[in-house]
Amino acid sequence: MLTSDGAVFETAGGRAVTLRPANEDDYEDLVRVYASTRAAELAQVTWWDDAQKLDFCRSQYDAQKLEYDARYPGAEYDVILLEGRTAGRIWVGRDEEEIRLLDIALLPEAQRQGVGAALVGALIDEARSSGKRLRHMVFILNEGARLFYERLGFRVFGEFSGYFQMEWKPESDDEAVGC
């Protein structure tokens, strides 16, 4: 199970990835992670200065967190550490039927190092062992992310508000025997 209990996940390159619960002291780092996900978009906004862009990212991060808190009570909000340094965030909700990867975001310097694959792989292992589906939403224009999840066995099953709804499901008995 993907938890922030001190478990160490290893990237394919052998780098140590750990999680810890996010707390108030992480706010600015988490806003920085959020801002990194909007950097290309905000680079096109020439009428705001850097302080205005940061204020926008704070307000958007706060709104996103409030939305997830309301829709997924009990969700886990963790800071991703790569060899002990803040590298990103992962938010996961669980219920009786599914595991939902609400959000995963990595700072640019932590991307393409196997961190996301290690963490999503741990969620897939949890889904497999619990017999639950694992769901995630990917922005329709983010082809790289969609392809990443498809390589891990996710399939698009719908669209909602500009996002692909993606799902990884444990193999059913019928699929396992080729029926």
Name each model feature, range by range.
Residues 142:
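Conserved HGGG/HGGXW glycine-rich cap/lid loop of the alpha/beta-hydrolase fold
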Residues 128-139:
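Conserved GNAT acetyl-CoA-binding A-motif
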Residues 20-21, 113:
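Helix-turn-helix-type domain boundary/helix-start signal
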Residues 2-13, 21-25, 32-102, 107-108, ...:
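Acetyl-CoA-dependent GNAT
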